[in-house]
Amino acid sequence: MRFYKVLVPMIESNLENMTTTEKEVAQFFLKQVTVEDLSSEMFSNQLHVSKATLTRFAKKCGFTGFREFLFHYREMMREK
């Protein structure tokens, strides 16, 4: 439930400030994808984006970096 109350609004409220590539990353996470391997390497390969893009996306969502974003994403997906 926290996923819908916390993470989704954080992503959606920052969409207008994102590049097209960052918006593609956002859409991936808004689909509530559950994956086994939650590493930046896996995401950059799967989404065909650089690790820097993942970091910029996370920072625009209010996190210090992609690791912090993944930590919260993982926690919220568990609670869902």
Named regions from a protein language model:
Residues 2-8, 13-27, 31-49, 53-80:
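HTH-adjacent hinge/linker in prokaryotic transcriptional regulators
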